[in-house]
């Protein structure tokens, strides 16, 4: 019971005769108080502190694991994005090369078509020229024949009598008829 009194009654009311006295040395008193408080804290707070530290440790470890998982996911996504980028670049290069080759092919096709058109026009021009030459030659031939016949007719008219003249005319008319039927 006496021990209980010591706790209930503050120290400054205790009588110095009983063996307890008021310690006025603040340094000593604070060290003892600090020692007692620290001892009590260590004894009673050890479990609580360990519990708090374990929870904090688990929280930090789970955060680190989550961060590592997110890092792996981000790395995987980055690799996939890089692969898609490379595929897109390859596709773009393929499209560009195909476009260039297609453009070259179209260019060559246009050149070939233009050459063919030019050759056809040249052939058509040459055919037209040959046709016109043949027509001109035929006209000249007909004119020469007509003039020759007229000249021969004049010569014969002057030189021949009317009977011979009639026979010659008939002969040449027959000749012209056969000539006319072969030209048509």
From Swiss-Prot:
Protein name from the UniProt record: ATP synthase subunit b, chloroplastic
Topology in membrane: Single-pass membrane protein
Localization per Swiss-Prot or TrEMBL: Plastid, Chloroplast thylakoid membrane
Family the UniProt entry places it in: Belongs to the ATPase B chain family.
UniProt cross-references to CDD domains, sorted A to Z: ATP-synt_Fo_b
Keywords: ATP synthesis, ATP-binding, CF(0), Chloroplast, Hydrogen ion transport, Ion transport, Membrane, Nucleotide-binding, Plastid, Thylakoid, Transmembrane, Transmembrane helix, Transport
Bilayer-crossing regions: 29-49
Native organism taxonomy: Eukaryota, Viridiplantae, Streptophyta, Embryophyta, Anthocerotophyta
